[in-house]
Design a protein with these regions (language model features):
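A structural signal for small-residue-enriched, beta-sheet-centric alpha/beta enzyme cores
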Residues: 20-122
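Phosphate-interacting basic helix/loop segments used at nucleotide- and nucleic-acid interfaces
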Residues: 6-23
Length: 122
């Protein structure tokens, strides 16, 4: 197995692999404040084994029109959902998400970081 991930994500992935024989997708998250929005959400700060970004540009929408801008931050959305399920202060550091048809990838969460030329807050 080729590991291209941060040390905490690598440790979680290797531990799961050694205990179960399966390599699950792993997302490590943290709280994140958002400009122009009240409240915080959890976002992915590391990931392994899962495609962090799902680019749907060029795909047809429900009306058959070609999508022009839809790029979904999958790892961030799953991180936020897991935080809601686990409870922010419940001291539940691990949440298992089932039922999402994820795509495997070894690219990591770096795909979520905005390119400097598109960053509104350099």
């Amino acid at each position: 197995m080729r590991l291209m991930m941060s040390p905490p994500v690598a440790i979680l992935t290797i531990d799961a692999l050694s205990r179960t024989g399966a390599a699950p997708a792993v997302i490590v998250s943290d709280s994140f404040g958002r400009p122009w929005r009240n409240g915080i959400v959890n976002v992915a700060i590391g990931s392994a084994g899962i495609e962090a970004i799902l680019d749907l540009r060029g795909e047809p929408d429900v009306a058959g029109r070609q999508m022009q801008a839809t790029v979904i931050a999958v790892a961030d959305e799953l991180a936020s959902a897991a935080d809601l399920a686990g409870g922010k202060v419940a001291q539940r550091p691990v949440v298992i998400v089932r039922g999402y048809a994820w795509r495997a990838s070894d690219a990591g969460a770096s795909a979520l970081v905005m390119e400097p030329e598109r960053d509104l807050f350099p």
